[in-house]
Amino acid sequence: MLNKRISNLATILRFIALPRARNIIAPQEYIANSVPVAITRRAARNTFVFSVALTPFVLYSAFHNDSAESDFPELVEVYPGVRPFPAVLGPPELPLQTNYKLLGHGVRAVTFLSFKVYALGIYAAVDDLPLIPRTLSAEYLSTLDTEKVDAPAKEQLYKAMQDHEKSRAVVNDLLGKGLRLVAKITPIRNTDFTHLKDGLVKSILNHPAARHEGETLANGLEELRAAFTRRGSVPKDDDLVLELQATGALQLYHRDAKTGQTTTLGKVTEPLIGRYLFSQYLSGKAPLSKDTKDSVTRKIISMV
């Protein structure tokens, strides 16, 4: 009898040691990347009951580590030839207001030849991550697709993000709730601050709502131009970091890849600038980086 109990305990501890503890209690559920977990309900239920009774602190640690760290590796390869992107950005490496977690990444390409210009990562404030599923509730999503109000939330969100207008509505509503974001722009080849500045200005002007804003947008764009307080070259692998803060302001930073030094550039206080820019990255008919938009879409779908 004692040997049998010891054997049962060993089995329990092996399950607890699994890197994704939540897989034990959620068989056949879609977890993060929608891969079904091949554990029977009965085995999972029995394991969970004994595990909670015997080792609550181990289980808590496993759940905590999974939610905080396991969704992403420490570094993510985005494009050959540029440094991998960190899964988390924040102090002290960068003077951001808080820590930000990678939502998705891709490459920005221009012209009909798909000339690749920079690698891109979109990050969300760690403290704001609960805003995403709370905003994109089943009730909210049902208002976006009145033809299939009973469809699963993930399906409704996927369809909304494939639609030009509905995807803008989703992103605008997230930003309207105060979701803080960061765009990490890493040039694939040598460039300069003027080219980066002109590219951002052009992208904002191409937002479909820009023509209706007139003087407000013009003043914001002047702020953006002035925020580029540095001149000269930006070598390949340097970073231009854009932080969309809680106030709607857009703070700019430049990180030198060779020295590791970060320079705080200027700030744009007009909220339209940051909102239009991130809307252009993540939604609409022709997002600035389709693979980044698709990558972020997959992540937020996994969160609802």
Curated annotation (Swiss-Prot):
Origin superkingdom: Eukaryota
Q: What is its main location?
A: mitochondrion
Q: Where in the cell is it found?
A: Mitochondrion
Molecular function terms, GO-annotated: intramolecular lyase activity
| First and last residues of the transit peptide | 1-42
Keywords of the record: Mitochondrion, Transit peptide
Keyword field contains Membrane: no
Tell me which InterPro entries the record gives. Chalcone_isomerase (IPR016087), Chalcone_isomerase_3-sand (IPR016088), Chalcone_isomerase_sf (IPR036298)
GO CC field: mitochondrion
- Belongs to which family? Belongs to the AIM18/AIM46 family.
Name of the protein this chain belongs to: Altered inheritance of mitochondria protein 18, mitochondrial
- Species source reads Eremothecium gossypii (strain ATCC 10895 / CBS 109.51 / FGSC 9923 / NRRL Y-1056)
Taxonomic lineage is:
Eukaryota, Fungi, Dikarya, Ascomycota, Saccharomycotina
